[in-house]
Swiss-Prot record:
CDD domains: RF3, RF3_II, RF3_III. It holds the Pfam family GTP_EFTU. Coiled coil: none annotated. This is Peptide chain release factor 3. The keyword Transferase does not apply. The gene is prfC. GO terms for biological process: regulation of translational termination. It comes from the Bacteria. The lineage of its organism: Bacteria, Pseudomonadati, Pseudomonadota, Gammaproteobacteria, Moraxellales.
Length: 531
């Protein structure tokens, strides 16, 4: 399809695609809500705490998430802000869903890291930062919960620098905290932004004043606290380096803002910083070449599959990140892995669970494709060119359970359910070659609960899981057919096929795995598999 290069460049420059990363309970879902409020994508803020009402947080749309108050699946939300188009990918904050989160981070151009001001850098944040590091993702930092007692801001900054190995450049500095939270002082604007309590559900423009030294602020904080604020501010100003955009884009430096997501204070500053500094859609690597966002032919890759987004339509949606060109309704695309041309007439755009038919989409946008079992995570779609996007892995699960069906007559429904749920990539199914068992592998215990809950709710299948003596799994590759055949004969009892039909070795112990690797050096035992 003919695309006007000028218009394409303009649309690419307007896009900002980012994800929020944080430890559970750092306020990520609340932040998502408030960002949507500023983007005027929602009128009523359904705060997460309102569990007794029907107004659950917009981005937690699966019933189990609403019961538990944790984000399990990655939602995608698009909203306008200051003549830009913002695509926000909400990632699961719960530790068990790291694989889904990892793949989401392959589809964004920057990330917002949220730190709980009372707790500082937590373990989950460290893990997610490692993923961002691998891709040099630019990071904006937000220290949350200033309306409560938090740790000393200087101490928090040193911890972020020491633990996450990233240079911090404060953009704002807090004046007081908890009951005495006055607001923030903007270091480059030399202005104080005042916090007003009880305005969390509204878009309010804060009162601002030049500088920070005012009698009412001194009175509110008291002499001791005001002196402590001035002292910390002086230290920050003395040590403050200039903000270096190149260092930020390389993921080596992070601008830091302070505020409260619940109180909707500092959220618009996050959006302003995102628009000002974060990069528009970047080039993406493929096995064949690098694809620039401004190329006029369409290309994109699938980073996530979600079954049953709408229980009313038993459907599966493949989430595709547009990498280049323009999607237009009804266009013909090549599904590269299958070598087939498909006409995409009904792609979707999202506001967490609300789906709207899409007329056009540009690089950086996330679109939903209806999937009837033919699309897999990692698949590329192009206007004909043979391109395979790289860097979207499957990880070896760490926990395994045998699936026991309560009603043997439902084995077909069970297989279908497990197959579809494993296509989403949070769990993996293995079929041992010596029996008819179904083995489920996951990164964390919570995933087994989620699968059982969803099989019951969405597929009307009840099952239980029992422990199985598998320590880990490895994908098997071997170019030497004779050596592979010999290995298959000897290891037959431990071999299985995964959901995609790939040969895997189910190791009963780490020692056994090491022995097999030593015994068969020509066989590759891989702990990840690219999609």
């Amino acid at each position: 399809m003919s695309v006007d290069p000028k218009k394409l460049n303009k649309e690419v420059a307007k896009r900002r695609t980012f994800a929020i990363i944080s430890h559970p309970d750092a306020g990520k879902t609340t932040m998502t809500e408030k960002l949507l409020l500023w983007g005027q994508a929602i009128q009523v803020v359904g705060e997460v705490k309102g569990r007794k009402t029907d107004r659950h947080a917009t981005s937690d749309w699966m019933s189990m998430e609403q019961e538990r108050g944790i984000s399990i699946t990655t939602s995608v939300m698009q909203f306008p802000y200051q003549e830009h188009v913002v695509n926000l990918l909400d990632t699961p904050g719960h530790a068990d869903f790291s694989e889904d989160t990892y793949r989401t981070l392959t589809a964004v151009d920057s990330a917002l890291m949220m730190v709980d001001g009372a707790k500082g850098v937590e373990e989950r944040t460290i893990k997610l930062m490692e993923v961002c590091r691998m891709r040099d993702t630019p990071i904006i930092s937000f220290v949350n919960k200033l309306d409560r007692q938090i740790r000393e801001p200087l101490e928090l900054l040193s911890e972020i620098e020491a633990v996450l190995k990233i240079k911090c450049i404060p953009i704002t500095w807090p004046i007081g905290m908890g009951q005495d939270f006055v607001g923030v002082y903007h270091l480059t604007e030399n202005k104080t932004y005042f916090y007003e309590k009880g305005r969390g559900g509204e878009m309010t423009v804060s009162e601002t004043r030049e500088g920070y030294d005012y009698p009412d602020i001194r009175e509110r904080l008291g002499a001791l606290m005001f002196a402590s604020f001035e002292e910390s501010l002086e230290l920050v100003q003395m040590a403050l380096e200039d903000f270096d955009v190149d260092e930020f884009l390389a993921g080596e430096m992070t601008p830091v803002l302070f505020g409260t997501a619940l109180g909707n204070f500092g959220v618009n500053m996050v959006l302003d910083t995102l628009i000002k500094y974060s990069p528009p859609p970047k080039a993406h690597p493929t096995n064949e070449r690098e694809v620039a966002a401004t190329e006029t032919t369409f290309s994109g890759f699938v980073f996530k599959i979600q079954a049953n987004m709408d229980p009313r339509h038993r459907d599966r949606i493949a989430f595709l990140r547009v990498c280049s060109g323009k999607y237009e309704k009804g266009m013909k695309l090549k599904h590269v892995r299958l070598g087939k041309d498909v006409r995409i007439a009904d792609a979707l755009t999202f506001l967490a669970g609300d789906r709207a038919a899409l007329e056009e989409a540009y690089p950086g946008d996330i679109i939903g494709l209806h999937n009837h079992g033919t699309i897999s995570i990692g698949d590329s779609f192009t206007e004909g060119e043979e391109l395979n996007f790289t860097g979207i892995p499957h990880f070896a699960p760490e926990l395994f359970r045998r699936v026991i069906l309560k009603d043997p007559l439902k084995s077909k429904a069970l297989q279908k359910g497990l197959q579809q749920l494993s296509e989403e990539g949070a769990t993996q199914v293995f079929m041992p070659q010596i029996n008819n068992d179904l083995i489920l592998g996951a990164v964390g215990v919570l995933q087994f609960e989620v699968v059982a809950h969803r099989l019951k709710e969405e597929y009307k299948v009840q099952c239980i899981f029992e422990p199985v003596s598998i320590a880990t799994v490895r994908w098997i590759h071997c170019d030497d057919e004779v050596a592979l055949a010999k290995f298959k004969r000897k290891a037959h009892d431990q071999l299985s096929l995964d959901g995609g039909g790939h040969l895997t070795y189910l190791a009963p112990s780490r020692v056994n795995l090491q022995l097999m690797q030593d015994r068969y050096p020509e066989v590759t035992f891989s702990n990840t598999r690219e999609h």
